[in-house]
Amino acid sequence: MRERGSNGLSRRHALEMLGFAGGAALVGRLPHSPRDPVVGPTRVSTTAGPKTFGPTKQIDAGRLNVGYVEAGPADGRAVVLLHGWPYDIFSYIDVAPLLGSKGYRVVVPYLRGYGTTRFLSAATPRNGQQSAVAEDLIAFMDALRIENAILGGFDWGARTAGIVAALWPGRCKALVSVSGYLIGNQEAGRVPLPPQAEFQWWYQYYFATDRGRDGYDKYRREFAKLIWQLASPKWSFDDATFERTAASFGNPDHVEIVIHNYRWRLGLAKGEPRYDELEGRLAKAPAITVPTITLEGDANGAPHLDPGSYANKFSGRYQHRTVKGGVGHNLPQEAPTEFAQAIMDVDSY
């Protein structure tokens, strides 16, 4: 019999869910099944090239003034794509035009603490907890009068999309999530992992210290580039590609949001009381009922779960795909064709 906690999760699954995906290094991959196809190979090199987005737009949404870009027709089916850390909207520089050319209205916002997104009030706490970022997405969709959308994301973005799919399924027509089910909670974040798994979270523990906070502030670009290299060890990106994104880390709230996010996961920083009810619901690891495709790169160097460990968290139509060819953590930018295809396929579910 498997040991279960108060929220109904097995102890093994609770261990795996540290923060957003801790402990995955210790979980062996399951054999591929018809629900777990291998796709690819794909390219693993990226140059910035001449491609760019249209002008960055700004809109007041909830507690933020959000910077975002769009592609495709204004009357197309809405697709909202969400980046992670330490990345930005340019993770979708190839995905957005691919989907736009197929008639989708693609919207890519900067998350709080990135790019041109700003807080409307200096008094608002610079809070990086998961439910705050999810509430940002709901407010952003409200501001753009998007009733529901296909949501896609990786890293922080996948977690945010998954939370909206779980708590507000009427706002999410379908979901594409890199690395699967990433909803976490502070209780899971307090559970110690075996040393090999803890080692993969070195930066989380570094951020728990004043030295880590100051070090990240001083060496934002160097830190981000190291994470890119570790998380995507086979991705060959040029300096222009990195610098294009690194400009987003100059946001005046970036460091506070990032540090609070990781400290909150470990229970070392408090959240805001306004999010307590949402966090209570998320702590129960709610199932995601909307149609979903999860993706994983075959060379993801960041902590991530084995697909077999989270398949039962998706109770609607579901498929997992492993993308071959040396694809790492930043899957939309490393494998844009496969990511865009997943969006189009899940739309038909």
What are these regions (language model features)?
Residues 10-22, 27:
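N-terminal export leaders
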Residues 71-116:
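Conserved HGGG/HGGXW glycine-rich cap/lid loop of the alpha/beta-hydrolase fold
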Residues 342-349:
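C-terminal alpha-helix
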Residues 84, 155, 333-334:
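Conserved acidic functional residues
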Residues 41-55, 63-66, 71, 78, ...:
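Flexible "cap/lid" subdomain of the alpha/beta-hydrolase fold that forms the substrate-access gate
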Residues 327-335:
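Catalytic histidine-centered segment of alpha/beta-hydrolase-like enzymes
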Residues 1-10, 35:
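N-terminal secretory signal peptides
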